Amino acid sequence: MLPYKTLLLALGFFFTVQCHFFASASSFDIADNNQNGVRLLRSPEKTDEERGAVDALKSELSFMKLNWAARSKITPKEKLVAKQAKEMSNTKEKLSKIEAKLQAKAVKAEQKVKDQAIKAEQNLKAKNEKAAQQLKALQQNELEKLAKQAAKDDKMYNRWLMAEMTPDDVYKKFKFKELAKKGIYPTTSVNYKHYKNYRTIYYARYPKLLEKLDA
């Protein structure tokens, strides 16, 4: 069965020929009215425009017939091969698109991991810097506390010196003997450091007393 386009062209060709026939018939001359029959005179020649239209339709029809004949001569095997080739081409195209999408996703995921690693490193660095600052502040506060405590202890030791208290007097004031009787060593007391510090200061101020003590 001819394609729809072929039918349309054939109808157009038929319509053109028919119109040309009617136009030619109207120009026929009647040669002799007295004779029994009517003799038609030779029709005038076709114009260039008419010949061009007819030739164009004939050419188009010839091409369509040839194409149709070529298609009709294709074997089932050739059709199957062509179909498989088309399906293979479509499959390759789909696979290429999928591969491109996967590569794009992989690149995006890799960049995301890199960004997260950089961000984590920056956060860790910031935390370390903050911790170092806090430690430095704590150490500074501790040093300030120690300095204040040392100044306070010095004033206390000076008062003991002004009161002419000996290290033995300080030892008695802290009641280390009573602690020893209870089984508590004086060295475990928080006040023992004051005794030791004052003893050092006292004998540094009165070295002769230390010589007598050693003697």
From Swiss-Prot:
The keyword Ribonucleoprotein does not apply. Its main location: secreted. It is found in: Secreted; Host cell membrane. A motif (RxLR-dEER) lies at residues 39-51. Residues 1-19 form the signal peptide. Residues 81-149 form a coiled coil. One of its GO terms (cellular component) is extracellular region. Induction: Expression is induced during host plant infection. It comes from the Eukaryota. Keywords: Coiled coil, Host cell membrane, Host membrane, Membrane, Secreted, Signal, Virulence. The RxLR-dEER motif acts to carry the protein into the host cell cytoplasm through binding to cell surface phosphatidylinositol-3-phosphate. Effector that might be involved in host plant infection. Belongs to the RxLR effector family. This is RxLR effector protein PITG_00582. It comes from Phytophthora infestans (strain T30-4) (Potato late blight agent).
